[in-house]
Amino acid sequence: MRIIYNEDLNKRIIPYVDKLIKNKKKLDKETAVLFDVFIQYLDMDTRYGTYGEQLEPCITEIIREESIRNVAHLFDGKLNKLLLYLLGDEYAGLFHTYLKIKARCPYTCGYSRRSQRSVDPTLHLNHVTDALTQFLKLRATGFNEQAILNGGRTPEEIETIKDAMSCQSWMAAQIAEGNATVIEYLQNVLTSENNANRLNQGHLQAIAASGYRPLLELEGKLLLAAKLQEGLRQAIVETMDEGCPESYLYLFSIIYDNGLQRFASVKRGIAVSTGIGEQDSSDRITNKYVELIRHFLNNQEDARKALQSKDTTKLYLALWSIGFYNTEDIQALIPQIIKEGAKYQVETLLYFLRCTQYTGMNHRISKEALEVWHNEPSVVASILPLYMNGIYLSRYGNYQEGPQLIDYFETKEEAVRHYEYLKQVYQSISAKETYSPYIFFWESAFLTRSDIVLKMAYITWMLHDSALRDDLCAYLPTLETYMRAGYIGIVLNPPTSQLQEEYVLQSLGDRSVDVRDEAYKVLSDMTLSPEQNLKVEELLRFKYSEMRINAINLLMKQPKEQLADSIRRLL
């Protein structure tokens, strides 16, 4: 088993995990199943395969069963048994403190993370599972607090494992609980003039998450003292939005009061946290931009009034500032903008929603927008990235059942109506439409027929309606080849009408090898008619060797008399 790349640290952790595995018979059946799923996620050999993908759905199901509304309470029910077994009483209590902190921190993650908050536990699962593995690794080392902070117990150990000792979530919880050892350590890190305890991003993330004012004040002084240290300034600005609102507000006030937005690193950090102006931030993050952020964060009523603004930057930052405190508050404001707002307002709203990483909310809002704005292709260009986002026509994995209608539409009739809306858009545009500038002078948007057909394909997939699949066959040639191959291999496997059979047969001669391969797999499981075999014979005149092999394999499945006829025709 490999839990971490660092070999020395891995050897330190494994005995603890092995002991947990050996003693799991003490667990009740349900907790034992959860434990097995977590271990598969923990083990790097299984984390990125089918087994590793089971943890999040398991937790999501528990959230649904227990009606958990706040991430702070995620491990209060049946998950608490797993937590206690994995970590023991002390670390489990500390993890509960971490969850209370997490409820006030952004849920977004990855390169496109933004300062958006919600207590919805399903939105925090990436962060929570990462933190749980971090707590378990630290618990498994058996290190005391000082050894964890130092990255080892001896100079030799520190040299080999310190860089692999992530502990920012643990530190944040310790700060929140008033742990003097951790607080004093971070004070020394922030004020030290030597490299004994080198400041890193994990330290800054822990301080931001905890919101502990004395440490924030030291961080603010460090920000002011950075002088020519652009890297230090950027690290502070890019981590100050990973914590509670108070951390961001305090450090942002230092930036504003001292005009630090003149530095390129500060501009980049602000652009990342808001989601606009990331490219060429030095030109786009102006004093007006910074003033709007400060004003809206401190005057939420003015932010709501600004939703009627004709200035797209002001409108965007007003939406961002509302989501900064609670993304769900945006949902109540949306219907009026969609129904009564100008086109630029709706486009700006949809553009902003991409930064929320809130798939369920974004689909609901984009669905409402399509009802009203399906006759405006430029608006549809902003709708589609949010619409049914999360579905993927992958040929790999167990996707045969397809997405559930109830997760995306109220009724079958609504889904069919949206299918027709998409057809209308398809017929009203060329193969690719470009809208430039779009919302902001530096932005462009694109809408392709392939994008539209993909969403139509998702609807036919979830409806299991043969007539609708027949209708889509006329539009499938426009679909990007990889997705078209996925549609053939999943939705048209097997075909449920003669028209679908003919489309799959035609795809056997497609230019794309992916499409040809999937068509061959589908046809291999069918009994072809004499007329269909004649069409297969036609493919032998093409030069693609693998196409000819597939055609011959299909023809060889014929009864002897029909096979003899094929041979005579081909000789």
Predicted regions and their residues:
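Charged, amphipathic alpha-helical stretches
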Residues: 1-92
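Residue-level signature of the C-terminal ends
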Residues: 23, 41-45, 61-66, 85-90, ...
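Extended HEAT/HEAT-like alpha-solenoid repeat tracts in very large eukaryotic scaffold/adaptor proteins
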Residues: 55-58, 67, 75-79, 83-105, ...
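Long amphipathic alpha-helical coiled-coil/heptad-repeat bundle
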Residues: 83, 99, 103-105, 109-211, ...
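Structural detector for internal amphipathic alpha-helices that build alpha-solenoid repeat scaffolds
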Residues: 112-119, 166-177, 188, 201-210, ...
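Amphipathic alpha-helical scaffolding segments comprising HEAT/armadillo-like alpha-solenoid repeats
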Residues: 145-148, 152, 180-189, 213-223, ...
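Short inter-helical turns and helix N-cap capping residues of alpha-solenoid HEAT/ARM repeat scaffolds
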Residues: 194-196, 229, 282, 310-312, ...
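Structural detector for tandem alpha-solenoid helical repeats, activating at a conserved register
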Residues: 313, 467, 482-483, 499, ...
